[in-house]
Amino acid sequence: MAVKGAAKGRGPPRRKQPRFETSRVQDLDDREPLNGEQVVSEDALNEASDAEYSVSSSDNEEEEKSTDKPYNVLLQLLNASEDSIGPAKKKRKLKHKEKNVKQQTEATKEASPGKGDLDLQDDLDVKEAENTESDNEQVENDEAEGSEDEADSGSDPFEIHFSQPDEAQLSKRIEATSQKWRTSRQTLPAGMRFTAVYPDVGEEQNLHRASLHSPKDLTLKRKLSEAASVHLPQFDAPNTSVAPYLFGYYDMIYGGRTTGNAAKLRDMYCLHALNHIIKTRDRVIKNNARVPKEGEDIEIRDQGFTRPKVLIILPTRQACVRVVDSISKFYQAEQQENRKRFMETFSTADDDTWEDKTEDFRELFGGNDDDMFRLGLKFTRKTVKFFSQFYSSDIILASPLGLRTAIEKEDGKKIEYDFLSSIELVIVDHADALLMQNWDHVEYIFSHLNLQPKEAHGCDFGRVRTWYLDGNAKYLRQTLILTSFITPEINSLFSHHAYNVFGKIKIDSTYPGAILDVPVPVPVRQTFSRFDSLSPVKDPDARFKYFTSTVLSSLAKNWSSSGKSSAAGTLIFIPSYLDFVRIRNYFATSSQTTNLSFGAISEYSSPRDVARARSHFMNGRHTVMLYTERLHHFRRYKIRGVKRVVMYGVPENPVFYKEIAGFLGIDPAAVGEAAEKGVRALFSKWDALKLERIAGTKRMGSMMLEKGGDTFTFT
């Protein structure tokens, strides 16, 4: 499993740490990457540019060679023959062309076994100008076939939101975004909470919508409706409450994603994305047919600056495979170009040794867990093309790191972001997993959405929608964030980068509390200590002061020269790596911890150092173990020898709390003593969201506001 570390730009920059000359400290300062981590070369990170300004969706393609390619020669011959053949033979030409492409594909594979797919990809990934010609040909073919779908309904959210918005109302809402937004709250079934935020235009709005129970309640294209009736006949609860906002083009952050409902949510947003791009394409095709009939003076506004309309941000390549599989269920194309190569480079089998890992871990890291990728998908009426150039793609799927390296080089020079100028639907799936990579990449991508393009890229500005030309595209873009839990970082992204003037929806859960489900056979003493903190900026210093003056002193005071200590078997769980470094340095240099032996392991520790530290801790040679949240996220170790848990801060993921507290029950012989010493966790008022998931929604309020004391104990 490739662990996401600084070598790929996920964490803090790799620096040489000062080595502590003491036998009590492990050699952890080298900060080597975890086992299996691959260092991405500069060439692999910066291959995004193609020719003049085309952006490639492949992260290992070579420069395209337009000369001496048999396939290009074939294309020239076909184009020459097409010039001499009339429109009546259009379909026959296309069939002939497909036949020759198939023959060329087979010939390429035979000529170059093992590299056939890569060589073919070089031929198929044509440049932007060539794609334009191909797209025009496909549009003509679509026109000849005619539209198979019914007329657009006036109640269709796509028509109301994008195609025919009320210009006066739209201007009024955009103007109101600079002022205070109104908020309304309601309670939903299954313990969910609903919050709606919308621009204050002088009148109160009720954004609560009735639940949708099946695709029959949606305005889908006929082709998608038929597939949805087979693969997604019903929306499961609580997805019925999510559906009206997802398909209604509201911005939404959904904090109830689980391993149980993730697949259904994925099917829903893939169906929505496909419906959007097909309606966009069909509208262009219909208007193309109007121009010859009604004259060139007719004003048609049906396009953006560039073709890509949907951006899906995902944590791993295997997550990308799952999304593509979902798309393929609903869009059953006759031909899928480069699908074989996609599966070979994006999908791998699960690790059979992970049977004891938790379900959420297997979902995230199962298969290919590489977080450096990007992929363009191009849709025509009968074909889906993988690894299409971004400017020819309809949907872009990427990891935050993969997409950022397509925008910006390592030296900070921006090379390309025009392909993001016309994104109308952006989906962030498994956002809580992205927090453990590098959240700065996500914010960087959002800051480059819907900007005015630097170049024309063949755009027909006479057909660009007015709200694109006015620089208002971000106010109509739909942003969907799906996460297992909501954090301040996710809230900040939604507040500062989701601008939908039709409304923003937040749906999150109420929590019974992870303290009720600790996997230890006897009751565990769980103590929460609150400390005062004036601001988030000052919180790290206040936490450190409280820890060293109160918690650590109680651990060290019973230490005796005989070598026995009540602090033995103490695991200190530290959420932040910066805090980890600070605590490690204090343990190594402070007189308060002179007689405390300790080990320290983090996401940057080598496998050898991790194994040695765990062994010393289990055998009692180390009294204290420092352990980071990010290391636990990537490895899910089961640490033996734990008799007491001290949490420097409560974890974001409530599953982590249960797993860390569960270390107390690993040794059956010592479980009674360990349960009595139990867990002690520090928190401040800035930890409200985390504390709610750990202690429970009802308990959190009193723990934050209680004036009679700052210590709360549960068993």
Curated annotation (Swiss-Prot):
Primary residence: nucleus
Basic residues: compositionally biased ranges: 88-99
Record SUPFAM superfamilies: P-loop containing nucleoside triphosphate hydrolases
UniProt key word rRNA-binding: no
Keyword Membrane tagged: no
Compositionally biased tracts (Basic and acidic residues): 18-34
A single GO BP: maturation of SSU-rRNA from tricistronic rRNA transcript (SSU-rRNA, 5.8S rRNA, LSU-rRNA)
Record GO cellular component, one term: nucleolus
Ranges of biased composition (kind: Acidic residues): 131-153
GO molecular-function terms, A-Z: rRNA binding; U3 snoRNA binding
Locations listed in the record: Nucleus, Nucleolus
Keywords: Nucleus, Ribonucleoprotein, Ribosome biogenesis, rRNA processing
Span list, region Disordered: 1-166
Function of the protein: DEAD-box RNA helicase-like protein required for pre-18S rRNA processing, specifically at sites A0, A1, and A2.
Subunit structure: Component of the ribosomal small subunit (SSU) processome composed of at least 40 protein subunits and snoRNA U3.
Family classification: Belongs to the UTP25 family.
Cited PANTHER family: ORF PROTEIN-RELATED, U3 SMALL NUCLEOLAR RNA-ASSOCIATED PROTEIN 25 HOMOLOG
Protein name: U3 small nucleolar RNA-associated protein 25
Source organism per UniProt: Uncinocarpus reesii (strain UAMH 1704)
